[in-house]
Curated annotation (Swiss-Prot):
Involved in the biosynthesis of the antifungal agent validamycin A. Catalyzes the phosphorylation of valienone and validone to their 7-phosphate derivatives. It comes from Streptomyces hygroscopicus subsp. jinggangensis (strain 5008). Belongs to the ROK (NagC/XylR) family. GO terms for molecular function: kinase activity. This is C(7)-cyclitol 7-kinase. The gene is valC. InterPro entries: ATPase_NBD (IPR043129), ROK (IPR000600).
Length: 351
């Protein structure tokens, strides 16, 4: 019989984050990324003294250079398209509105897809990084789901009826900037605000909180598994040691983590109550480093907050971790590019 399928398409995929730029190759529609190169991003983290516009230019020069180097590889067909995952809010037509972790303050709106198309001479698909990560799970998750990344910050996207739920101008999916602490001295957010969810429940926020707790209660800190690795110095506590202590059941670490996760539980409860999504996937370095401990403590707090109409079992069943790797954005942007660029063609297949 004759069926429609997508012609294979070799892509260069890139994930531009505030800390690291990852570039690799993928066949659109597959989940196998290869020839991945990781380099420090030439942005705010490395050149913080430069003006935002200069940093934006520097980042785009680096992105163009690294992608161009992957267009042709020994023993492989030339790439036919490019797909880029970008750490920042983006409009539906690929214009980056801000890059707080990349170039900090205000810079010109960046039509990243158009710029790269002009420079590289190939079709380019661009999307926000959390949007890209959500696309990795689109085929495997038959029901609507919310993907949340919990790393140095927090971001989310809801995938429903085959698309990401965001406004054409890119609004939506920025739950990390939801105000949850109204105190004037609340934890600072990278956007310049204070008391945002991402400043409290992220890996960075949770580390800030456990260090503050250690400084405030020296005796409890001294009894904690965190005291040894840090030499008894609160500011020497690391995320790695914090996650290890929490996984091992250390009371001090777990209670501090629990407090940090409470506003995230409130966010999940709000999303469920508002739009009825019953599947929440969590990725990001901090969440995945904590593993089942993250789900247990977040589940405890979600049960305490409550999800209207659900019992404890159904409430906890909504939470799950994504794959334990750092390829979410590379794989996901490849899947998104296949959906946008893949041209259907008729092929003969055996029934």
């Amino acid at each position: 019989m004759t069926a429609l399928t997508l012609a294979p398409c070799d892509l260069v995929v890139a994930d531009l984050g505030g800390t690291t730029l990852r570039v690799g190759r993928i066949t659109a529609g597959t989940s196998e990324v290869h020839d991945v190169k990781r380099v420090p991003t030439n942005g705010l983290g490395r050149y913080g003294a430069l003006a935002p516009q200069e940093l934006q230019d520097r980042v785009m020069e680096q992105l163009t250079r690294e992608i161009a180097a992957h267009l042709t590889r020994p023993g492989q067909a030339p790439a036919q398209a490019v797909a880029v995952s970008f750490a920042g809010p983006m409009t539906a037509d690929g214009v980056v509105l801000a890059g707080p972790t990349l170039w900090g303050g205000p810079a010109a709106p960046l039509p990243v897809a158009d710029v790269l198309t002009q420079r590289l001479g190939l079709p380019v698909v661009a999307a926000n990084d959390v949007t890209a990560a959500a696309w990795r799970y689109a085929a495997a998750e038959p029901e609507p789901f919310c993907l949340t990344t919990v790393s140095s910050g927090i971001g989310n996207k809801v995938f429903r009826h085959g698309e990401i739920v965001i406004d054409q101008l890119g609004y939506g999916g920025e739950i990390g900037h939801w105000l949850v602490d109204h105190a004037e001295d609340a934890a600072p957010c990278e956007c310049g605000g204070r008391g945002h969810l991402g400043a409290i429940a992220s890996g960075r926020g949770a580390l800030f909180a456990v260090r503050a707790a250690a400084a405030a209660d020296a005796s409890a800190f001294a009894r904690s598994a965190l005291a040894g690795p840090s030499g008894g110095v609160p500011e020497a506590i690391t995320n790695e040691a914090f996650a290890a202590a929490a996984r091992a059941g250390d009371t001090f670490a777990r209670e501090s983590l629990r407090r940090s996760l409470r506003p995230l539980a409130s966010a999940v409860s709000l999303l469920f109550t508002a739009i009825g999504v019953r599947r929440y996937l969590f990725v990001g370095g901090f969440a995945l480093a904590l593993g089942d401990t993250f789900l247990t403590l977040l589940g405890d707090e979600l049960v305490r907050v409550g999800c209207f109409g659900l019992d404890e079992y159904a409430t906890r069943a909504m939470l799950a971790l994504g794959e334990d790797d750092d390829d979410h954005c590379l794989i996901g942007i490849g899947q998104l590019a296949a959906a946008r660029l893949g041209a259907p063609r008729a092929v003969e297949v055996t029934a």
